[in-house]
């Protein structure tokens, strides 16, 4: 009788252990499934954050270039490569540091994709006068083609336009004064074209 009870207890114990083991396996499976889902969710969030950071980094990398470009356009309106040029009323001007003849000065300006200055307004005359005080500078004015017919380098004449000749000029003294320069007083004077003086180049504002 005691042996039968013992045998029944053993069977009950074994059955309970199996059921408990199955429950433990199911719990482990659920935990693994939840862990996998959580890992997938975290990976998705991480990838999204990485993508957002990459986008922000690209923006930050491009911003300095834009900022530098904006800064350069404010500091050097005539272009970062034209820092020796001066801006005035929508155009750029170069005041030379060396002296040469009128024709050489004209060629120098053309090499810099510009031309000898054309003074066609009182405002521009004042700008040049202030900038060239006590020195002589070539301007883009000559009567080499026809004596007394003064023309700017762009082909326009001075008969109906602004002029600022010094009193008594142009006088063609010596019969070969065919090029004009700004006198030390800021007024214009005719002189022979081989005379060496400074010069002013002019060009449009870069687009």
Swiss-Prot record:
InterPro entries for this protein: C-type_lectin-like, C-type_lectin-like/link_sf, C-type_lectin/snaclec_domain, C-type_lectin_CS, CD209-like_CTLD, CTDL_fold
Alphabetic keyword roster: Acetylation, Disulfide bond, Endocytosis, Glycoprotein, Lectin, Membrane, Receptor, Signal-anchor, Transmembrane, Transmembrane helix
GO biological process, one term: endocytosis
Domain C-type lectin per the UniProt entry, residue ranges: 77-203
N-acetylmethionine carried by residues: 1
PANTHER family: MANNOSE, PHOSPHOLIPASE, LECTIN RECEPTOR RELATED
Function: Hepatic lectin is a membrane receptor protein that recognizes and binds exposed N-acetylglucosamine moieties of plasma glycoproteins, thus mediating their clearance (from the circulation) and endocytosis.
Name the UniProt record assigns to this protein: Hepatic lectin
Protein's organism: Gallus gallus (Chicken)
